[in-house]
Swiss-Prot record:
This is Intraflagellar transport protein 46 homolog. Residues 283-301 have a biased composition (Polar residues). Component of the IFT complex B, at least composed of IFT20, IFT22, IFT25, IFT27, IFT46, IFT52, TRAF3IP1/IFT54, IFT57, IFT74, IFT80, IFT81, and IFT88. Interacts with IFT57, IFT88 and DAW1. Interacts with ARL13B. Interacts with IFT56. Interacts with TTC25. Interacts with IFT70B. Keywords: Cell projection, Cilium, Cytoplasm, Cytoskeleton, Phosphoprotein. It comes from Bos taurus. The modification Phosphothreonine is found at residue 283. Residues 1-13, 31-52 have a biased composition (Acidic residues). Forms part of a complex involved in intraflagellar transport (IFT), the bi-directional movement of particles required for the assembly, maintenance and functioning of primary cilia. May play a role in chondrocyte maturation and skeletogenesis. One of its GO terms (biological process) is cilium assembly. Belongs to the IFT46 family. Residues 1-63, 280-301 are annotated as: Disordered. InterPro entries: Intraflagellar_transp_cmplxB. Its main location: cytoplasm.
Amino acid sequence: MADNSSDEYEDENNKEKKKTSQLTPQRGFSENDDDDDDDDSSETDSDDDDEEHGAPLEGAYDPADYEHLPVSAEVKELFQYISRYTPQLIDLDHKLKPFIPDFIPAVGDIDAFLKVPRPDGKPDNLGLLVLDEPSTKQSDPTVLSLWLTENSKQHNITQHMKVKSLEDAEKNPKAIDTWIESISELHRSKPPATVHYTRPMPDIDTLMQEWSPEFEELLGKVSLPTAEIDCSLAEYIDMICAILDIPVYKSRIQSLHLLFSLYSEFKNSQHFKALAEGKTAFTPPSNSNSQAGDAETLTFS
C-alpha cells in the first residue's frame, strides 16, 4: 500500500511540473505583447503630433518669412514671442433646452358687423358721416356733437342738435352721473380762452422772472401789504399791480385779468408746487426766530 501511494504522489508532481513548464513561455509572450502595444500607441501618438505640428495651417505665421527684415535686436526678440504663444482651447458647452412659452390669451375687440353692406346696395358712409364704434360702449350723440363743435371751434354755425331727455330721471341716477362726468371732462379739456389786450401788457413768462436780490432782501424785512391795509379797493389793486410790474390803465379790467392769469400760472406750476411743499415740510427754527427778531426790530423802530 505504501509503494502504490508513493507512485501516485510522484505522478501528480510530474504533471504539475509539466503544466508550469507550459505556462511560463505563454506569460513571457504576453508581456512582450504588452510592450509591443505600448510601442504602437506611442508611435501613433507621435505620428499624430507630427501631423499636427508638421503640417502648418494655410496663412499661419512662418518665422522664416521675417528673418531678412532690417530691424533691431529688440524687435527680433518681439517676433520670438509670436512662436512662443500657445492659444488656449476653450470648449464651450452649448445646451439646447426646449421650452414652452407662456400662454397669453388675446381677446380681440367685439365686432358688431356694422361693415356689412346694405341689401339695397346704397352706401351707409360708415366712418365718414356716422361714427364707427364697438357696440359695447357707444358714445352719447349730444356729447359727441359738443366735442366736435369744441374741437372745430365753429360755435356760430346754426345746426340741429339733439336734446337728450330722460324719462323717470329719479329712477336712473347712473345716467345723470354719466352726463355730468362727460360734461365735466369736456370743460376740463377746454383750452384757456385767448384774450387780446387793447393796451400793451407784459408777457406771463416775463412776469414770472425772479426779482432782483435787493428787492428780495427788502421783502425779507418788510412784508407785502395785506388786504387789511386802510385803503380803497382801487388803490389796493394799483399797489399790488405796481409790485408785480403790471401796468395799470384807466380801466383796471385788463390789469386784473393779467394778475389772475399770473396767479393761475404760479398755482399750476409743478416747480413752485415742489418749492412750496419743501418749505412747508422743512421749516428750521433758526429762520423763524431770526424773522421774528427782524419783525420785532422793525416794529419797535
